[in-house]
C-alpha cells in the first residue's frame, strides 16, 4: 500500500522499540517509498517497559542508524526536555507537539534547541482536545511566522504537500 498515491508515512505505535534491529526493514521501506516514519516515543523509567515502548534514546538511535530517513519522534510532552536533547544533533529527527497536557515553556525550548523547522504540530486525536493541542502552540511565546511553521508548514514540507 506504500506505493498508493497519497501515502505519506509509516506510524509506529507503542508495540515496538525503535532501537530493535528489525527497524532496519521499516527504514528500508521508508527510503524506498520516500516516506516519513512517525515513532511513538515516551520517556520511560521502568526498563521492562522498553521492550514495547520507545524511549527518546531509542528513537534517537534509530535516527542515527538511518540518517537518510525522515523521522518524527512523537509526543513532545511525553519525551520532554530529554527527548529534545536526544534529537538535537540529528537533523533527520523531528518532534511533534502531541502527548500529555501542555507544559509551559516546552515548545519554546524545542524550537530554541531544534530550530523552527524540526518541530511540528501533533494532535494525538482522539485522546486530546484540539483546543488544547492547538492552544499550546498559539499560546507559546513565539513569532507568528514560527507558529505557522509548527501548525502546518513543517508538516507540509515533510510530507511533500503543496500548500495553495
List the predicted regions and their residue ranges.
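Hydrophobic faces of well-ordered beta-strands that scaffold small-molecule active sites
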Residues: 8-12, 37-39, 71-74, 93-97, ...
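Acidic (Asp/Glu)-rich catalytic clusters
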Residues: 1-6, 25-33, 61-66, 85-90, ...
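Short acidic/histidine-rich active-site segments
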Residues: 75, 114-131
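C-terminal helical cap
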Residues: 77, 98-109, 148-162
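Mid-to-C-terminal alpha-helical segments outside catalytic/metal-binding sites
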Residues: 116-118, 131-164
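Histidine/acidic-residue-rich catalytic or RNA/ligand-binding cores of hydrolases
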Residues: 49-56, 81-90, 104-113, 129-139
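Active-site gating/metal-coordination segments in enzymes
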Residues: 1-45
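Conserved, mostly hydrophobic/aromatic
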Residues: 1, 30, 75, 95, ...
Amino acid at each position: 500500500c506504500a506505493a498508493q498515491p497519497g501515502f505519506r508515512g509509516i506510524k509506529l505505535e507503542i508495540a515496538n522499540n525503535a532501537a530493535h534491529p528489525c527497524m532496519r526493514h521499516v527504514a528500508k521501506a521508508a527510503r524506498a517509498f520516500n516516506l516519513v516514519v512517525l515513532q511513538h516515543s515516551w520517556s520511560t523509567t521502568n526498563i521492562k517497559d522498553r521492550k514495547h515502548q520507545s524511549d527518546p534514546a531509542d528513537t534517537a538511535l534509530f535516527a542515527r542508524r538511518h540518517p537518510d530517513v525522515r523521522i518524527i519522534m512523537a509526543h513532545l510532552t511525553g519525551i520532554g526536555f530529554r527527548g529534545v536533547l536526544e534529537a538535537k544533533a540529528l537533523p533527520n529527527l523531528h518532534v511533534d507537539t502531541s502527548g500529555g497536557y501542555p507544559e509551559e515553556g516546552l515548545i519554546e525550548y524545542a524550537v530554541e534547541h531544534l530550530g523552527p523547522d524540526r518541530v511540528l504540530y501533533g494532535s494525538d486525536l482522539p485522546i486530546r482536545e484540539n483546543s488544547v493541542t492547538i492552544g499550546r502552540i498559539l499560546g507559546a511565546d513565539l513569532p507568528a511566522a514560527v507558529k505557522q511553521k509548527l501548525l502546518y508548514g513543517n508538516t507540509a514540507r515533510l510530507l511533500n504537500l503543496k500548500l495553495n
